[in-house]
Amino acid sequence: MTQFESSRATVHIVGAGLAGSEAAWQVAAQGVRVVLHEMRPHRMTAAHRTGGLAELVCSNSFRSDDASNNAVGLLHAEMRRLGSLVMRCADANQVPAGGALAVDRDGFSAAVTEALDNHPLIEIDRAEIDGLPPADWGNVIVATGPLTSTPLAAAIRALTDESALAFFDAIAPIVHRDSIDMSKAWFQSRYDKAGPGGSGADYINCPLSEAQYHAFVDALLEGEKVDFKDWETAPPYFDGCLPIEVMAERGRETLRYGPMKPVGLTNPHDPATKPYAVVQLRQDNKLGTLYNIVGFQTKLKHGAQTRIFRTIPGLEGAEFARLGGLHRNTFLNSPKLLDVRLRLRAEPRLRFAGQMTGCEGYVESAAIGLLGGLYAAADARSCTLEAPPQTTALGALLGHITGGHIETIDTGPRSFQPMNINFGLFPPLADPPTRKPDGTRLRGNEKTIAKKQAICARALSDLDRWIADALRPAAAA
């Protein structure tokens, strides 16, 4: 064994949250030694309250457990098929929550901690890594989450570039393309400008009359806002990331001269009438199934967002893949910085997992930890593991992180933002269902349900094939 191979034989994982804990379990399950580094309880974050591994800082819900109709439920099912520790401990500590999987947070964390503590191949090191991991660690997973300590975050930023990490991220709502009413909206770029990769008709535009605009501004000003957490109050807003309601507070016309300016656009449905304001939506993924509302980062509560944004002409029936938000977060510009196996292009011995990579949510973080663990174990054993198909929830989420987004057409801030798993990340069905088993035609919501069920069935079938064709041979090598 060469010195390089020896340095890869032990996997060092920094951070024992959901992603790091799951990664450690997956690595050890492949017969590879793990050192799991966790700074708590010696150094706490502003959000954590215990030294337990995989502590749930906010909600105790893992969201829907419906693997036939819901994207996160599908992700649950895929992770269970891959022996996920997080899912096993969640199932063992479930509390009643209707169709959702919610857990006793203390029991869940205790179960994860006990499982990792008792595994013969896992060593838990309760110490802070206050900079880049030592150079002689040849196989590292960094899974330090959105509250990464300042010294480590600074070291990562120095290794990449100044804009690689966002400490106060702006999240705009994302809408499913097929829920937008195109009898009111239209495709057009301002002045028909075709940017890199664009056609000159790259935005969906929703026009507002003067009365509609002022009613919208009033609703923003009156809408209920989310309070900042204590640990979120120090960082300033980044330029260009002001919440839309803050812009509205600065003057009734501010939005008309900002993200809602109507210039360079003509409504083909009513070309003689110039819109007073225009809301633009920009394609958010390569598949063209998701569009984000440009400039609409917000701290409005979710109920207020859906109510207010559905007053926009063309968005009355909008279905949201993600609602907006603005909060302290640490995440990489992963499509630029990471390769398809989650390795840092600038230093491939470092692999990233969890919320730092640009996934959002407990289950998504654990899922990327699972994949990171499988990749690190394969590296330790000098094997190559192919990525899961993008038709699976795991593959779709990985695709979003490592390249499934598209760059913004205009110059300005990068477009990559954290996201939950949702059906908009999956490739379309080659042959969408149109009829019921009895031969009658599917209509309305029936068609939507059948489509989701077909996507879920395809995903589980393709995952089983990937396990048999790629994962098992790699593990046996």
UniProtKB/Swiss-Prot annotation:
Localisation: Cytoplasm
Main location: cytoplasm
Keyword list, A-Z: Cytoplasm, FAD, Flavoprotein, Methyltransferase, NAD, NADP, Transferase, tRNA processing
Catalytic EC class: transferase
InterPro entries in UniProt: FAD/NAD-bd_sf (IPR036188), MnmG-rel (IPR002218), MnmG_N (IPR040131), TrmFO (IPR004417)
Keyword flag Transferase: yes
Catalytic reaction equation(s): uridine(54) in tRNA + (6R)-5,10-methylene-5,6,7,8-tetrahydrofolate + NADH + H(+) = 5-methyluridine(54) in tRNA + (6S)-5,6,7,8-tetrahydrofolate + NAD(+); uridine(54) in tRNA + (6R)-5,10-methylene-5,6,7,8-tetrahydrofolate + NADPH + H(+) = 5-methyluridine(54) in tRNA + (6S)-5,6,7,8-tetrahydrofolate + NADP(+)
Any GO CC annotation of this UniProt entry: cytosol
Gene3D superfamilies: FAD/NAD(P)-binding domain
Cofactor: FAD
UniProt EC number: 2.1.1.74
Annotated function: Catalyzes the folate-dependent formation of 5-methyl-uridine at position 54 (M-5-U54) in all tRNAs.
Family, similarity comment: Belongs to the MnmG family. TrmFO subfamily.
Name this protein carries in UniProt: Methylenetetrahydrofolate--tRNA-(uracil-5-)-methyltransferase TrmFO
Organism: Nitrobacter winogradskyi (strain ATCC 25391 / DSM 10237 / CIP 104748 / NCIMB 11846 / Nb-255)
Gene (UniProt): trmFO
